[in-house]
Each structure stands twice: as structure tokens, then as C-alpha cells.
Amino acid sequence: MCEDRLKTPDSNGNWGNWHSCLKHLEVYCDEATTFDDIDAEWIQGFKDYLNTAEKDAQKKTDPKVSYVFVGLSQNSKVSYFNKLRACLNQAFEEHIIDKNPMRGIEGFKAEEVAREYLTLEEVKKMAATPCNYPILKATFLFSCLTGLRKSDIEKLTWGEIQKFGKFTRIVFKQKKTGGQEYLDISDQAAAYLGTRRNDVDRVFEGFTYGAWTSLELKRWALAAGITKNLTFHCARHTFAVMMLDLGADIYTVSKLLGHRELSTTQIYAKVLDKNKQAAVNLIPSISE
């Protein structure tokens, strides 16, 4: 059933999670395991396995190579356990099993992850600093100004770019969620699009993101005097925090980011809580 989910995942971005979950299940149990074998004890065993599992489930031990054990992150455990839960729930709903062994079993609790982002001044520094790969600079700054994910930037075509008077709008389907989005962008962001070509042409032709571009992003940031551990996705976080910091209301920011739930956007409001920042300065000086 997990393999079936891999063929038709609910989102393209979720495929990797299903694939990783399947690999860990293959390590935990043998091919002869059936639904009849899965009970509360088996599920608890899988939880215990995830607590001790290595990040790379396919890693082979080579006596000539020294390995450093890297366990699963808390949120990876949450994701993989929930994948198993989804499979068992589906099996129960489709009457493949008479009882759902997952009922009443508590999963892992998600861990809140700090979001790295750039301040407006840092974005200005990045913009003013040369980058060895102009396409990387253009796409990263475009993401800082629009909040678009790199996966959507990679596939963006000119047919998705529309002009409405003075405004530029991107009409596209999110790769991660499949949701239809209507994103108005600023003139400043539109300037990074370049010269319009055929509708089927990619806007940022030649842009792909991998290990070398990740390294180059860090080099570019260091050249700008920024030592934060940047990834391309930090640009999306940067957009969200900048919008809230500049006074945009959270509902509008949520729509611009294409979030399905407002609670997802509220994480950024928590990062930038000016009320708390002001409150801590209310205490008078305690120095004589």
C-alpha cells in the first residue's frame, strides 16, 4: 500500500517522504509481513525502530570507511509514522482489515524548527554582491520578493506570467500542493523575469538547484558578509517575515504564500513578534 502511494502521492513534494518511509519499513520488517502481522506491538516496535534508526536506511556498512551515525530528526519520525498511520487507516476504510491496530496509539510529537531568514538589510547586501552564477542570484532574489518555492520557480513558464495593466500576475499550480494560485508580484520582482519569450519557454531557463548551487549560495552569502546557514528555501521565509515586518496583514501574507491553513503563516508571526520585543523593554533600569 505504501508502494501504491508512491505511484500517486497527494503532492509531488510528498513523494520523497513516502519513498523514505518505505525504505525504513523494508529495514524494519521482512517481505513476508502481512496486515495480519500488524498489531499494537508491531506498531510500537516500528516506533522504537524510528527512535534508533539511521537517517539513510540504505546505508551499507563498509569496514574500510568510518561512518558517523546520524539519526532521524524528530519531524522525520513524525512524517514516517504518519505515513504508516495513513496506510492502515486506508486499509481499514477499504475493509482490507477488520480492525485498525493504529487506533489509540499515540504518534510522535512534532518539533518546532527555527526558520532561517534574511533581514531587509541583508537582502540588500545580497543584491549588491556579485554572484558567480547570475541565474542563481536572479532566482534567489526573485524568491525573496515573491515567496515562490524553488520547485515552482524551476518550472515557471512564460505562459503563467500575465499582465493586468501595470500589475504582473503569476497564475500557476503549486508543485507541492497542486493548488491553483494567483500571485501578484511587484515591479521590482518582475524586473528579474527578463525578456518575455514563448509561452512554453521556462522563465528561468537553465536554473536547477543541487549540491553545487547550494554551495554557491553559501559562497555568495559569505561574500556579502552573511554567515547564516542559507538554503534556497530561506528566501521564502525571508519574504514572509519581510511582509509581516513591513505591515502586511497576516491573511494577505497567507494568501501570497499559498498556505492552506492560517496556522502555517502564524509561525512567521511568532518569529517576528514585535509586541514581545517591546514588552521586554518595559522594565525600568535596575542599576543604581
List where the protein language model places each region.
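C-terminal catalytic core of Y-nucleophile DNA break-rejoin enzymes
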Residues: 175-219
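Conserved tyrosine-mediated DNA breakage-rejoining catalytic core shared by Y-recombinases
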Residues: 104-107, 116, 120, 155-193
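DNA/chromatin major-groove-contacting recognition/catalytic segments
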Residues: 125, 181-187, 191, 195-196, ...
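Basic, Lys/Arg- and aromatic-enriched nucleic-acid-binding interface segment
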Residues: 56-61, 69-74, 78-82, 93-97, ...
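Short basic/aromatic active-site micro-motif
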Residues: 38, 79, 210, 227-247
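Basic/aromatic-enriched alpha-helical hairpins
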Residues: 1-68
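C-terminal catalytic core of tyrosine-transesterase DNA break-rejoin enzymes
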Residues: 141, 145, 151-152, 236-260, ...
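Catalytic-site neighborhood detector that most strongly recognizes the C-terminal catalytic loop/helix
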Residues: 174-178, 257, 261-282
